Amino acid sequence: YAATDSGRFDGTAVITPRSGAVCLRAELPAGVLQNAVAALPWTMAREEKLFMNGYQTWTACPELGKWDRQHGVERVPKFLLEKYSFDRYGDYHFVPYSGKRGQSHGFSYCYFRRGKTYRLLASLDEAPGYTIFSYDSRAAQLRIERDCAGVQHTGGSFPAFSLFFAEGTEDEVFDAWFAALGCRPRTTRRLAGYSSWYNRYQNIDEASIQEDLNGCK
């Protein structure tokens, strides 16, 4: 469903792990968007692993078991939070963490992995707002939400979700997603990069950077 402060749209669609590209639109009256939500029945085997992509890939996002807990920053000592502001790097201040087993969330894409078989669910368009995936193992439900609350809608068709579903090996599902996005590698040559941040943080000057660059030769 999706809604503005002037009215609501409810609809259904048939979706499977092999559906490929799926576009869900909602006819809404003009007004301020309140939400856009889709709920899918989605079972997870006990031996499967779940990956939820962290907010802008900054939030901690390990693979989780079916009944694992997704942690925020509650285990980080308060003095470290105050000194380094670790709680500002991710979504910890605007997405609730239940702390319950089997409940997790992430942004833009997620996958369920059973051995070498992946079920990928991913967004094809984040322009209308971030796509937030949430999974509840106990309810066997995958919730998809568009971060669009507060946006003015002029009325008519709203692109609630533009999604991609694929099942196969890791290379198969991600290559298919990138192809659907029109994302092509700029080169097939292996590339390397350098950043001073994780070695020196803000303590940099010309001499320290030159030392690092000399070490890369």
Show which residues each predicted segment covers.
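Carbohydrate-recognition beta-sandwich/jelly-roll modules
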Residues: 1-217
